[in-house]
Amino acid sequence: MSCVSQSAGSLPPLCQWSGLEPICKIPPSQQFQQIHCPLITKHRSSKLCDLLPPGVTDSIYDFLANLPIILLFVASVPARFIYCIVYNFLLNFDQFILGIEYSIINPILDFFTAPLVYLAVGLTDGENNSAFSPPYLIGVLTDACLPGIVSGIYQAIGDIFYTIGYGIGFILGLFIDLYDIILYSICTLVTFGLTFGLCLSYDIVGIFKGAGGLKFTIYPFSFLAGLLQNYINCGCVLGSYPTAYIILCLNFGGSCPSCCPCGVGFTPPACPAIPNGTPPSPVNLSVTGQGCVSEYPHSENGSGGSGGSGSGSGSGGSGSGGNSGSGGSGSGSSGSGGNSGSGNNG
């Protein structure tokens, strides 16, 4: 003997829901990498840029011996001055650019952009109810680039905008949670199924033995599920239908089949009331005579059995998904076929 399942009412397959879906919060922001000031390259000088030639002032004898060269150096000061300007500008151009970038350009850019970054970081932290922790200087600015007082001003401005963003995000997170819980509660109510069952097993001296059961499932608000099917995507909200079961088992030397979970229990939906990640998206597979098959990453819900097909041109209907599937039957022009299937929550 096997388990016989009957139901009062039916629910749409998970993949046939459409409409409002739960809102997932923005993931908490990661702390920004602090880009420190670059190492300034070593300054390169030219001996022609010195006022006097090197090594001529060590003694009076060196000075007198090199007097013509010294006079030439003094006479060529104007020309060497122009040479040194060009030399330092060309060979030390990287220092010149870095000085402009990190002392003028970047502070100005960060002054206008950093407050918005602080606001965005505070928004995500507040929305996820994370710890209130304003980050340090964001962008290319650190205390190695600017004087301490300037860095303090930038940090104070960032703290203000972080606080504003945190407050807005916290209030927004409460509304998102309320919205998700309302959708979750509505979908749980309209798709809830209650199963009553009786299972019997017997084994008399190994001669007379058998096991079987009867289950009857009620969907009290299945009519509401049909009304809301195109307005709330309960397949995405729940991931699987919630069910409760009350099954009585009578054992006379045997054991009840696995299709009859003896006792009282409740199987909640696969998805949480407040989603902590991307909601599962159903994958619709077109199958002839069967409609669609729903596959959820977190779904443990079984699928209903498919209807049989006759030997003629007619084909059977498809079983319904949910807690239990009802078998369809089909008839051909010269024959008939029937089949039944049931889906159980894992």
Swiss-Prot record:
UniProt subcellular location: Host membrane
Organism: Acidianus bottle-shaped virus (isolate Italy/Pozzuoli) (ABV)
Stretches with biased composition (Gly residues): 302-346
GO cellular component: host cell membrane; membrane
Annotated keywords: Host membrane, Membrane, Transmembrane, Transmembrane helix
Membrane topology listed for this record: Multi-pass membrane protein
Chain spans, region Disordered: 294-346
Tree of life domain: Viruses
Protein name (Swiss-Prot/TrEMBL): Putative transmembrane protein ORF346
Transmembrane segments: 67-87, 104-124, 134-154, 156-176, 181-201, 219-241
Main location: host cell
